[in-house]
Amino acid sequence: MVWISLGLRAIINVEALNMVESVGNVTRHRKAAIVYRTKSGYVIRWVPAISGETMAHAYQTWIAELAKKRKLPICSYCSINEFVKHSQPELFGTDPWEQKLNQIIKQRNYDPHIVEVEIIKNCVVEDIGGFLFPGPRPVKRTSRFSNGYLIPAIDAIEKVAIEPQFHVRHAPKAQQVIGQAQMIYYVEVGSAVYTWTFALDIDGIGRTSMIKVEDVISNDEKIRRIECAIDSLALMLDSKIFGAKLTRFNPLIDYESIVVTISHRYPFNVSPPSHSNYIKDTLHRSKKFSEFLGDEVKVLGYRVDIEEIEKYNTIMDLMAKVKDYVKEFLKT
């Protein structure tokens, strides 16, 4: 097994990356309840948050874009960033392999393994991001990547802001024609030191997992998909293009630190970046993990100041080295 884990902290100011509802003329930001400990006990607080689904959609969008440019297989809907993922027969696309698979599942006694094999072979987004077909014989592929919400750091929880911003659409000429063309509206925006975690099961790419475990693509194809998965993560983080309302509420994002680990035989995850000491804690745990299990864990970082961690000046340099280590581990 080769496993990648990533944790980061970022100062994000004036963002509207995940909105959940409109009440009258107010568009509300997503909020989540978090629990943390103080000197007097535990406290619950509602804070701005960006959902894991939001981040997963952005990541899979980058996978789809790279897949098209690199001539990797991708299904009809994923190619236009609609990740409905063969969830119903009506949503099977127009590609010949999809039409053929649609005929197979109409027989009702189909082999679920065959369905998983065909979708993995023909769509890199569903290979990496998983899918669920709830038919007479359900077929479920668990996503090869996992990620959480972007939530404020616990050690900066008192420095969180969420407020409605006042806006006016000023259209005096249009108002003469239709009336009430000039309108006021509010958009809630959040500012905080946000944290995020991500993990990627490298070995699971191009490999079935539901009925039986087997590789269904060539080794060369697997390497190309692994590179696509890592490059998509690098592009998303470096470009800072993820989330909603970027055209008018593109936030100021400043990464404080990013830590990536690559483990060889067992999954090792970066410590939660809820506190600034997560970098030291990750390094300490990686050493104990290696001693206990005899596994090798590489620890790399961007904007970190610990001597024993491999440091890189850009996100692209960091992720390029991650790819190198992954390929090295896959050979052993």
Question: Over which residues does each language-model region extend?
Answer:
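Active/ligand-binding-proximal structured segments within catalytic/core domains
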Residues: 45-60
